[in-house]
Amino acid sequence: MSGPGGVGKSTIVDALIERDANLWLSRSWTTRERRQGEKQDAYKFVTREQFEQHISDGGFLEWTDFLGNLYGTPTPSAPSGKDTVLEIEVDGAQQVKRLNHQALLIFVLPPSRQEQKSRLHGRGDSDQKVEKRLQKAEDEEPVGKAIADYVLINDDLASTVDEMSRIIDYERKQRNS
């Protein structure tokens, strides 16, 4: 799953993982500071040096520099029988799609830029950071839509999670038929 900041990716993923025992989240690494109130396990928070060493060791499926912080998905090692969920930026989604054309990409958008702005402020982002994220979202949206298998607008969490569950179930049936 990919989408700009403030669309609710983490909240959606948490709900999906709780609902579907056959999903496994590959926890992303980041060098950014943990936000106030953010769960300890939202990411694996590491230093830039640790992150760069992991890059050197070939330990990431994909990684990107996003607004001065590094984000990366460690090479997944899902338990047997589980489908891996990646919660990644658009740059990372492009890398994953290049590596695995069969990877399913669901791109999530906010109902409006105003709502996105409100969500970003609500999680404690500064005005400057919010403006950077909104500009980045404008730039990423056409790319995300172009590479996505599905595009969803998260205007209601329960509906979005239900729709994602239906998509995952449908894709599993297609894969197994």
Language-model regions: role of each:
Residues 17-26:
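Post-Walker A helix-loop "phosphate-sensing" segment adjacent to the P-loop in P-loop NTPases
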Residues 6-7:
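ATP-binding Walker
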Residues 125-171, 176:
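Small-molecule kinase domains that catalyze NTP-dependent phosphoryl transfer to phosphate-bearing small molecules
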Residues 10:
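Walker A/P-loop
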Residues 30-84, 91:
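ATP-dependent small-molecule kinase phosphotransfer cores
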Residues 85-89, 98-123:
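Conserved phosphate-donor/acceptor-positioning beta-strand/loop module used by diverse small-molecule
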